[in-house]
Amino acid sequence: MSSLPPAIFLMGPTASGKTDLALELARVLPCELISVDSALVYRGMDIGTAKPSADVLAQFPHRLVDILDPAESYSAAEFSSDALAAMAEITAAGRIPLLVGGTMLYFKALQEGLADMPAADASVRAELEALAASEGLQVLHDRLAQVDPESAARIHPNDPQRLVRALEVYCVSGLTMSEHRARQRSQKAGPDAPGSGVLPYTVAQLCIAPAQRHILHERIERRFRHMVEQGFVEEVEALRSRGDLHLGMPSIRAVGYRQVWEYLDGSSTREEMVERGIIATRQLAKRQFTWLRSWGEVHWLDSLSCDNLPRALKYLQSLSILS
């Protein structure tokens, strides 16, 4: 049995039932929940993120939910720092950290660490975002391909956040993101060094998803249409009315929010907005599956199974996660 304290990762694509299973686990285990979701960090973004209700959050508090205003940004490095601090507090209290969500980059940051990249530069970022707005994202991708073909091959031409960040790193430091990562690998940092990727926990990794992809697609469509019925458009209208938010911000680029925002801008009809939101959510799920297929040892659970809780508990017991 490992001398390291236990932790549980509960991963899966959007609309797979992660939250429901997490709550079931929290009812029977001495654990505390930590959200691993880049959209749930934002206050006032509740319907479109499928955020647990206020009653649920009161009964089962989630760390790293509602910690930021939508005008703020939040990086994987910041998440990793916050999550590690929360995990340490939970462990010190004699409980088990249960990390649940679908932002796979955040899980990766915890497991493997992040390259030591230069800090963001607001002026450089503003210039790059202005260039993208005036000439299109393809111009940014072409520029990145010239200086850092490895990153350009990895980053989709329609991914503004990662394109801007990769170019920002180069403009600020004179080194490409690929060069920074290569330097980190060559340094072979010790196990206690920042970013070394050694998580000081015995981690059990659970993943929940429907066994059949078309089932997930149907769930995504039902959920998105239900969100619209529950007031998703009005939620985005309230965000727009503030006057300090725009489509270039990470919060508003979140899946669903972008499509509703564009609808309110007059770029689509209501039904087109719904269809685009469903398609964007399915594309997100596909990307999440891509991450998960390349992940390490993961115990898979079928969303439609009626015995996921005992299956999960049996797996955790087999790893000596449960005493």
UniProtKB/Swiss-Prot annotation:
Catalytic activity, reaction form: adenosine(37) in tRNA + dimethylallyl diphosphate = N(6)-dimethylallyladenosine(37) in tRNA + diphosphate
Site (Interaction with substrate tRNA): T103, R125
Top class in the EC scheme: transferase
Pfam families: IPPT (PF01715)
InterPro entries, alphabetized: Dimethylallyltransferase, IPT, P-loop_NTPase
Ligand binding (ATP): G12, P13, T14, A15, S16, G17, K18, T19
Cofactor(s) for this UniProt protein: Mg(2+)
Enzyme Commission no: 2.5.1.75
Keyword list, A-Z: ATP-binding, Magnesium, Nucleotide-binding, Transferase, tRNA processing
GO biological process, one term: tRNA modification
Molecular function as annotated in GO: ATP binding; tRNA dimethylallyltransferase activity
Gene3D superfamilies reported for this sequence: 1.10.20.140, P-loop containing nucleotide triphosphate hydrolases
Interaction with substrate tRNA as annotated region, ranges: 37-40, 161-165
List of residues binding substrate: T14, A15, S16, G17, K18, T19
Stored SUPFAM superfamilies: P-loop containing nucleoside triphosphate hydrolases
Subunit structure: Monomer.
Assigned protein family: Belongs to the IPP transferase family.
HAMAP family: IPP_trans (MF_00185)
NCBIfam families xref list: miaA (TIGR00174)
Functional description taken from the UniProt entry: Catalyzes the transfer of a dimethylallyl group onto the adenine at position 37 in tRNAs that read codons beginning with uridine, leading to the formation of N6-(dimethylallyl)adenosine (i(6)A).
Descriptive protein name: tRNA dimethylallyltransferase
Organism field: Stutzerimonas stutzeri (strain A1501) (Pseudomonas stutzeri)
